[in-house]
Each structure stands twice: as structure tokens, then as C-alpha cells.
């Protein structure tokens, strides 16, 4: 049974804001043309590209080489742990020698072979390296604190962006080209503060109001 896989992408057309210099938003045809131009189609991947035969950007050649190397598999690089986690792994193994490499691998979310390499390694950080790491993390914490203080004082840029249209693009497995599946138009919300407040005509409110006057 063939299962049709549809991949949809959403793009927002902004009529104002710092993201666009034009006064009006992009049309759906222009967005589709831009996405199709920057995408790597299946036809380009299946064809044999030789030097000098086709004018293909370098980034497309690299992407095709990576896809050919993976052979259709998902890119899943091995996980790396920090030096602090390595020290914690060695300390855990020293205190609990009955733990196997598989147990430690499940705990730290790495492969058992990586656990064996870490335990066999005799490398340790010196006192100077520990002090440098401490000072680096201290400076990083100060920068993060300053960044949050600036955000509290300044307005967010996202509040200045008005979204007027949302174009939903889609493609199927038979054709690599994208098509516009839906276009939604949003009206900006304008609070009307000039309208007078309506008087409450509830009977309980009127009786309470008359009782307070007496």
C-alpha cells in the first residue's frame, strides 16, 4: 500500500516590520519560486552530476554527497558528553564497580563503546584548566544576566511585526515542486477605545445602586 507523504511548510507574509524592506508582502508565486530554487529536488539527486557538465552550486553538491553517503538513512551523529559528565561517569564507576558499560551507557545516553573509551582514558584536567573553566562559566553567567536585564528594559521586536497573510505550501512524493495549498488572511486587531462604555442594565445592579444612594 502506497502511503502519500505530504510535507507542508508555512510562510508568513509581513506587510511591515524589520524583516522586509518592501511596503507589501511577497506573493505566493514568488515564495514558491524562492523555495523551489533553494531546495534539493529528487531529480537533481538521481542524476549523475559531473564537473563542467552542469552549473550546480557548491552547497548542493555537498548536500548530494552527504545524502549519498548516508544512503537514505537519517543523519544521527553520535552523542558527545561534556568533561564534567566524563568525571561523573568515572566517579560513578569507581563507587559502583558492579555497573557495566551498558548500564552507564543507558544512564548517560551514549554507546557502550564510548563508555569503555572514557574509562580507559587516563586524561585528567589540571588545576589551571579547572580554574579557567570556572572563570569562563562565571563570565557566561554574567553575560546571560545582562542579556535578561536588557530584555526587560527593551520592547520585543516581535510585537512590532504585523502578520497579514499565511501561505501554506505542500508537496508530495511524486513531484518535488511545491504548490500553494491554502492562503489565509488575517485582519490586524485594533482596539477601539473611543466607544463609550455601556451602562449595566442588570436589575440587581440597579437595586444595589439605588440602595447605595439611600
Curated annotation (Swiss-Prot):
Function: Required for respiratory activity and maintenance and expression of the mitochondrial genome.
Residues of the transit peptide: 1-18
Signal sequence bounds: none
KW Transit peptide (keyword) present: yes
Family: Belongs to the RRG9 family.
GO cellular component: mitochondrion; nucleus
Organism: Saccharomyces cerevisiae (strain ATCC 204508 / S288c)
GO biological processes: mitochondrial genome maintenance; mitochondrion organization
Main location per the UniProt record: mitochondrion
Subcellular location: Mitochondrion
Protein name: Required for respiratory growth protein 9, mitochondrial
Amino acid at each position: 500500500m502506497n502511503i502519500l507523504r505530504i510535507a507542508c511548510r508555512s510562510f508568513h507574509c509581513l506587510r511591515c516590520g524589520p524583516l522586509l524592506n518592501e511596503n507589501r508582502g511577497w506573493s505566493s508565486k514568488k515564495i514558491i519560486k524562492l523555495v523551489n530554487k533553494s531546495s534539493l529536488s529528487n531529480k537533481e539527486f538521481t542524476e549523475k552530476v559531473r564537473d563542467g557538465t552542469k552549473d550546480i552550486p557548491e552547497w548542493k553538491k555537498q548536500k548530494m554527497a552527504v545524502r549519498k553517503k548516508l544512503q537514505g538513512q537519517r543523519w544521527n551523529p553520535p552523542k558527545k558528553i561534556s568533561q564534567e559528565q566524563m568525571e561523573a561517569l568515572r566517579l560513578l564507576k569507581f563507587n559502583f564497580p558492579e555497573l557495566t558499560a551498558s548500564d552507564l551507557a543507558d544512564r548517560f545516553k551514549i554507546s557502550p563503546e564510548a563508555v569503555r573509551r572514557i574509562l580507559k582514558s587516563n586524561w585528567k584536567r589540571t588545576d589551571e584548566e579547572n580554574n579557567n573553566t570556572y572563570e569562563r562559566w562565571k563570565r557566561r553567567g554574567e553575560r546571560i544576566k545582562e542579556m535578561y536585564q536588557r530584555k526587560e528594559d527593551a520592547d520585543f521586536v516581535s510585537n512590532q511585526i504585523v502578520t497579514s497573510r499565511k501561505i501554506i505550501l505542500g508537496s508530495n512524493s511524486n513531484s518535488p515542486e511545491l504548490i500553494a495549498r491554502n492562503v489565509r488572511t488575517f485582519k490586524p486587531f485594533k482596539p477601539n477605545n473611543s466607544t463609550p462604555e455601556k451602562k449595566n442594565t442588570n436589575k440587581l445592579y440597579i437595586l444595589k445602586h439605588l440602595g447605595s444612594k439611600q
